[in-house]
Amino acid sequence: MSFWEKEFGDADEAEDFAGRKILKCAYGQTTSQFGWDIDHIQPISKGGTDTDSNKQIVHVNTNDEKADKTTFFIDNIKYQVQKTSRSDEDSWANGYDYSNKKYCIVEIEN
């Protein structure tokens, strides 16, 4: 099973946590309007691991803007990487299911 299928099932399109539309067929396509990459939620440089529980699918522009930061802005919205609480009601953040993740990304006040 591909990572896309683990995250989004059989959907051909989805949105990342920042609301950017991505297409299953556009993996790694940096010039595509709908290109996507696999992001380490907690950056490796900040102690994150290279495991599925620390990865998410994001638009290529989202990945570039987030880079290896744990607090960052995308479209003038401030986001922060936080440890996941693991409770059902807290497993969703910005429309993205983080229930099987060690970390999540949440929108915070500027």
Could you say what each language-model-derived stretch is?
Residues 1-28:
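Short, charged surface segments at domain edges that flank catalytic/cofactor-binding sites
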Residues 5, 57-60:
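Generic alpha-helical structural context detector
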Residues 9, 63-65:
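Acidic glycine-/aspartate-rich tracts in secreted/extracellular proteins
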Residues 23-58, 66-71:
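Histidine-centered nuclease catalytic patch
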Residues 47-53, 65-110:
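Polybasic, low-complexity binding patches
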